[in-house]
From Swiss-Prot:
C-type cytochrome. Part of the cbb3-type cytochrome c oxidase complex. FixP subunit is required for transferring electrons from donor cytochrome c via its heme groups to FixO subunit. From there, electrons are shuttled to the catalytic binuclear center of FixN subunit where oxygen reduction takes place. The complex also functions as a proton pump. It comes from Azorhizobium caulinodans (strain ATCC 43989 / DSM 5975 / JCM 20966 / LMG 6465 / NBRC 14845 / NCIMB 13405 / ORS 571). Binds 2 heme C groups per subunit. One of its GO terms (molecular function) is iron ion binding. This is Cbb3-type cytochrome c oxidase subunit FixP.
C-alpha cells in the first residue's frame, strides 16, 4: 500500500515538479498545483469584506423587514435626501417663475432660459413617453413642433390643455371627440367622404365623382365641426383637414377607419400631479418647441 501511495503522488515532471492528487481515471491524473498565495489572500479579504458589509449595511431579509446595518444607511433614504437637495436648488428659480405672469416669461431671456430648462426636465419625465423626447409625437399623439393645434397653440391654450387634459375626467378639460359614422353612413358614403377629405389637402383629386359625392355628404354631416372649408374649429378640437398633417394617418384606409369608428384620444390632466410653476414651465417649453402661436 505504501509503495502504491507513493507512486500515485510521485512528481510527474521530474524532480521538483508538481505531484498528482492521487486520483487516476483512464490514465488521466490530476496535478496538485496550489493556487498562488496572492490569490488566496485576495479571496480571504473578500470574505472578510463581505462579513463587514453584512454588519454595516442592509443585507439580510427578515419576515417583515430586513437587517438595517449599524450605519443605518439605505439607498431609498439616500434618494429621498438627494431629491430634497435638488428641490432646494430649484426653489429659487421656481420662485422667480411663480411670481411672473405666464405671458411675460418669454420676454425675459433669463426667465425664458429657466422655464425652458425646468420645462425640458418635466417634459422628459411626464410627456415624452407619448409625445417623444423632442415633442415629435407618434401615431395618435400630436407633434408639438408643428403649428397644427387641435385645441389652440397660444400660451393660455397650452396651459389649459396641460392643466386639465383632454377627455381626462376633469370638468374643465377638453371634451370634444370625433363621432363614429359607421352606423350612420353607408360604406360607399364613407368611402366617398374619405376621397373628398383627402382632396382638401391635395392628397387626392377633388374632381372625381366619388369626391364630389363625398363633398355633399361632408357638408351634411361633417361641416358642423370641421367647417364648410374643412379648416376645423379649435373650440371643438376639430381637426384642420386642409393642412396635410394627420394625427392617425392620411391614407384612405386610415381615414375610412376614422370616419367609421370615430376617435377619442385621451390626455391626462396634469394639474393634480404637477405644481403650477412646473406647468407654467412646461407651457413655455412646449410653446417654444417651434409651433407655438
Amino acid at each position: 500500500m505504501s509503495t502504491s501511495h507513493e507512486s500515485h503522488h510521485a512528481p510527474v515532471d521530474g524532480a521538483g515538479g508538481p505531484s498528482t492528487t492521487g486520483h487516476e481515471w483512464d490514465g488521466i491524473q490530476e496535478l496538485n498545483n496550489p493556487l498562488p498565495r496572492w490569490w488566496l489572500w485576495t479571496f480571504y479579504a473578500t470574505i472578510i469584506w463581505a462579513f463587514g458589509y453584512w454588519v454595516a449595511y442592509p443585507a439580510w431579509p427578515l419576515v417583515s423587514n430586513y437587517t438595517s446595518g449599524v450605519l443605518g444607511w439605505n439607498s431609498r433614504s439616500a434618494v429621498v435626501e438627494q431629491i430634497s437637495d435638488l428641490q432646494k436648488l430649484r426653489a429659487a428659480s421656481s420662485a422667480k417663475l411663480a411670481n411672473v405672469p405666464l405671458e411675460d416669461i418669454e420676454k425675459n431671456p433669463e426667465l425664458l432660459s429657466l422655464a425652458r430648462a425646468e420645462g425640458k426636465v418635466a417634459f422628459a419625465d411626464n410627456c415624452a413617453p407619448c409625445h417623444g423626447a423632442g415633442g415629435g409625437g407618434a401615431k395618435g399623439f400630436p407633434n408639438l413642433n408643428d403649428d397644427d393645434w387641435l385645441w389652440g397653440g397660444t400660451l393660455a391654450q397650452i396651459q389649459q390643455t396641460i392643466t386639465h387634459g383632454i377627455r381626462s375626467g376633469d370638468d374643465e378639460g377638453h371634451q370634444g371627440n370625433m363621432l363614429a359614422f359607421g352606423s350612420i353612413l353607408s360604406k360607399a358614403d364613407i368611402s366617398n367622404v374619405a376621397d373628398y377629405v383627402r382632396s382638401l389637402s391635395g392628397a387626392a383629386p377633388g374632381d372625381t365623382p366619388a369626391a364630389k359625392k363625398g363633398a355633399e355628404i361632408f357638408a351634411a354631416n361633417c361641416a358642423t365641426c370641421h367647417g364648410e372649408n374643412g379648416k376645423g374649429n379649435q373650440e371643438l378640437g376639430s381637426k384642420n383637414l386642409t393642412d396635410g398633417i394627420w394625427l392617425y394617418g392620411g391614407d384612405k384606409a386610415t381615414i375610412v377607419q376614422t370616419i367609421t369608428n370615430g376617435r377619442g384620444g385621451v390626455m391626462p390632466a396634469w394639474g393634480p400631479r404637477l405644481s403650477p410653476t412646473t406647468i407654467k414651465a412646461l407651457t413655455v417649453y412646449v410653446h417654444t418647441l417651434g409651433g407655438g402661436q
